[in-house]
Every structure is written in C-alpha cells, then in structure tokens.
C-alpha cells in the first residue's frame, strides 16, 4: 500500500524563514517524511530540495496589492497539489491554496492556526485594503476546513471565539515543537565576540521581528530600569511598518544615550549563531502582547536559559511560571489587538520581573535546567508528527 501523500502549503520554507510558522513547517516536514510521502509547496525562489516546489508571484500581478499577489500564488499552488491525499495549509498566506485544492481535487484540508487575522487588526497598516482579503482567505478556509490544528489551548479558544461557525469538534491542539538536538547549549563565544556581546557581563536577550504583537517597544522602555552592568541584546529586524521601525529606532537611541551594552543586530542570523547568543543570555525576554504559542521561548528554554515572558496567549502553556521562568501579568484590550490597558504598568511589571530574576543567580540556573528538561520531555517533533498524522487519518487522508 502506498504511503499517504501529504502536501504542505506554506509561505515560508528554508532558507526563506522569517517567523515561527516557517520554523514549524521546516521541522514538521522533516519528521513527517518518516511517516508519509511529503510534498512542500512554498513561496519564493526555487529550492534544491527534493519534493519542494516554490512559486513566484505571478508577473501579471506585479505592482498589485500585496494580498492580491499572495492569492495569485495560492491559485498556482492549488493546481500543483493534484494527486495528493490531504492538503495542510499554514497561515493565511497559504489558506486559500488549501481551500481551493480541497474544492478542486476533492481532498481533505487541514489548517494549522499559528495566528489569527481578527486578532491582528494592526495589519491593516501593512496591507491596506488587502487586510480585508487576508481576513476573507482565513475565514473561508477555517470555516470549511476538515480539521483545524491549534498550536496551543489558548489558540483553540481564540479560533472558536473568532470563528463561531467552526465546529469545536474539528479543532485539535497539537503544540509547536523544538529540535532539542539542534537547540542545545553552545558554550563557545566566537559569535558573541563578533557581535560585540561581552560574555563576562549579564545580558537580557530578545529575539524576534519588529511588530506590534512582539512588544519590543515595551521592553525598550522597561530596559531603562535594568542594572547598569546588564547588556540588552536585540536580535531584531524586519519591521512590519515604517512607523514601528521608527519607534524602535528612537527608543533604542534614547537607551544607548543613557547606558552602555545595548547591542542591536538587525540582520537575520543563522540558527547556530542565535543558539550561542541564547545560551549565554542571563535571561531571555518575550514581551509579546499577542503570541499563540511563542516557539522562541522553547528555543531559549532548550538552550538552558531562564525566561521572562508575558502571560498571554499560549505562552503560559510553554513557560512554567516559577519553574522555567517568570510570567509578566497583563490586562489587555478586548478588541483583538492585545494592547495593554495600562501600558505603564505593563512596562513596570516587565522591568520588575527581569530585575527580580537578575538578582537571583541560583534561580536563573535552576530555571534554565528545568526549561531544558521541559522542552525535551514535552515538545519533541517526533511526537508532534505522530499527532499530526492522526489528524490526517481522522479526516480520511
């Protein structure tokens, strides 16, 4: 009997990976290949990898709205899935491809909810009228999908709130994972030396894109309260909008004028370099105001680094408060934006949690060791692949 053919549909795939969804698809594809015939359909430049097809934006849509160009890629992608047993789409960028393939080829469509357009209303700044298109693509796909995989229980709740037409029985929780063989402590310092990070000084590290949801401006304000000897290391690039890019630039310049040790790396670093920075971090900070799961927290934990993170979305399912890190309380607007109701209090609480942990080296070490154990025991990719295959089987894949 031929193995099940699974077609994964995604905007991001190595080497063009910008966020957690791209990391997820990379490792899911790798592990699923042990269990199924996996084909990957992605955006961008041609890939050398067998079983991977990349799609460029249609030339006829050059200059059109960004969301419209995405939809053009999706239609080509749907055509490329002929012969599959099940299609599995990731993020709104590929949801239309999955939905169209379901209708065109009569195959089940599984969607993974990494984030939700209704909970990111600020994206209207990026996409203009295209935000209505991205929201339509996602809603249409979710409401018709044979199964929806939520990357956390928090995300499952959000899916059912955002899309009340979805049958709760079709929404399963399968967590994001971590490759704990790759994400493991690296005690070397060559990368730190090159980036200008002093391994002899404590460091607070942030890794992520510059978007409203990631909350970097709150961290930059909270960093004013850090002890003078603590470095602030930002592996942060790709601002979503010129406005947030300018805000972060201004806050960073203000901070640099008052303290030393502010290291900002705007370029996307290869994984092994990020791992070394995470390993040497005294604490890793995730100030997100919207985070369905926060795979970056897992990456830090796997590197034996204590975490300070916002108690929002799926983060409390990853970061065990008082065991692998400290959670920062937050009261948020109910409009889906995640905006703190009291931004000054959130900044003060973030600063307080960072300073509480920085003052306790024994606790930092204990949290780091416990974080590594938790990552290994609960978030392995082989288990996630098995659970995902079960979802495919349940819908007749």
Locate each region found by the language model:
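Nucleotide-sugar donor phosphate/pyrophosphate-binding loop at the beta->alpha transition
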Residues: 107-108, 118-140, 157
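Nucleotide-activated donor-binding/catalytic signature segment of Leloir-type glycosyltransferases, i.e.
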Residues: 245-268, 272
């Amino acid at each position: 009997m031929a193995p099940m053919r699974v077609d994964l549909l995604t905007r991001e795939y190595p080497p063009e990976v910008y966020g957690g969804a791209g990391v997820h698809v990379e490792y899911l594809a790798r592990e699923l290949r042990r269990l199924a015939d996996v084909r990957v359909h992605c955006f961008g430049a041609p890939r050398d990898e067998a079983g991977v097809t990349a799609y460029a934006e249609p030339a006829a849509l050059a200059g059109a709205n960004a969301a419209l160009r995405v939809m053009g890629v999706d239609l080509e992608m749907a055509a490329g899935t002929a012969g599959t047993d099940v299609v599995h789409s990731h993020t709104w960028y590929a949801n239309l491809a999955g939905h169209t393939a379901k209708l065109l080829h009569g195959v089940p469509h599984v969607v993974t909810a990494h984030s939700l357009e209704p909970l990111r209303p600020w994206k209207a700044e990026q996409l203009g009228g295209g935000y209505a298109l991205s929201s339509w693509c996602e809603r249409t796909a979710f409401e018709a999908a044979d199964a929806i995989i939520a990357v956390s229980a928090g995300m499952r709740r959000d899916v059912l709130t955002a899309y009340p037409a979805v049958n709760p029985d079709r929404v399963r929780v399968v967590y994001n994972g971590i490759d704990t063989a790759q994400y493991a402590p690296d005690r070397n310092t060559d990368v730190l030396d090159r980036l200008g990070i002093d391994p002899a000084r404590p460091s607070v590290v942030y890794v992520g894109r510059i978007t409203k949801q990631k909350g970097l401006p709150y961290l930059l304000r909270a960093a004013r309260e850090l002890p003078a000897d603590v470095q602030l290391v930002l592996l942060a690039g790709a601002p979503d909008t010129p406005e947030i890019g300018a805000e972060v630039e201004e806050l960073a310049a203000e901070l640099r004028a008052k303290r030393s040790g502010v290291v900002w790396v705007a370029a996307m670093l290869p994984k092994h370099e990020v791992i070394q920075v995470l390993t040497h971090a005294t604490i890793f900070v995730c100030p997100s105001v919207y985070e369905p799961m926060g795979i970056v927290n897992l990456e830090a934990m796997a590197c034996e680094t204590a975490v300070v993170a916002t108690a929002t979305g799926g983060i409390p399912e990853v970061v065990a408060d008082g065991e692998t890190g400290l959670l920062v309380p937050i009261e948020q607007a109910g409009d889906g934006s995640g905006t703190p109701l009291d931004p000054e209090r959130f900044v003060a609480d973030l600063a307080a949690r960072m300073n509480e942990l920085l003052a306790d080296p024994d606790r930092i070490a204990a949290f780091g060791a416990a974080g590594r154990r938790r990552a290994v025991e609960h978030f392995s990719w082989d288990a996630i692949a098995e659970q995902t295959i079960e979802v495919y089987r349940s819908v007749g894949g």
